[in-house]
């Protein structure tokens, strides 16, 4: 029988209690004279998955990176409006390292650190002094088990992460993000370079993480948004065009731009084409 993990309180997965709510309020973003996104107001309910859809250049990735303040040091970046986390502006003068413990991020391509597999997982735990060194392996085992990677790496925790496959590296990066117990997890096309098996595994993890986290994910994959999203927001040419429950947005879009973008996913009148996909939306919500 598998022994129960005894994690330090600071790194034990919290019991969902309402958690944080992130909110963008009249947010305008730009770089120099160019405005990338204009007057976006959008709520992210606690313990839910919100997917951000839109064509390339619509502003959704700039928006996502702003939620983590990743754009702060980009030349010419400017913003007006606000983003609130737990009712407090994220743009206040604050410790960005501590802020990013609360708002984690997983990128399109895996970015393991040049250190051992175990040290990767506990990097944030060590930096934030969330657990004593003697408990690092316990923390690493818990998070690697959660993402389904423990059995593959348990005998090679001292190895370089660059010896892992691309999919395994992405799972390692997810374990690292989860090890510090963020309130919000931002995902920037996290499966775009992965094989179907790993993609399915990560999508399942996203759904299970929504039991305790606020998850916000950029994706270009309509089917992925349908499978994972509780809510979906559609961006087009620097505007938030439409947002709402994923089922409603996929089956009953209200704006012309949304209808056109979702057309390949929705069956034509009197046709069965795409019916399995739209049925999946209806059944998953």
Curated annotation (Swiss-Prot):
Keywords: ATP-binding, Cell membrane, Membrane, Nucleotide-binding, Phosphate transport, Translocase, Transport. It catalyses: phosphate(out) + ATP + H2O = ADP + 2 phosphate(in) + H(+). Residues 272-285 have a biased composition (Polar residues). Its main location: membrane. GO terms for cellular component: plasma membrane. One of its GO terms (biological process) is phosphate ion transmembrane transport. Residues 22-262 form the ABC transporter domain. It holds the Pfam family ABC_tran. It is found in: Cell membrane. The complex is composed of two ATP-binding proteins (PstB), two transmembrane proteins (PstC and PstA) and a solute-binding protein (PstS). This is Phosphate import ATP-binding protein PstB. The gene is pstB.
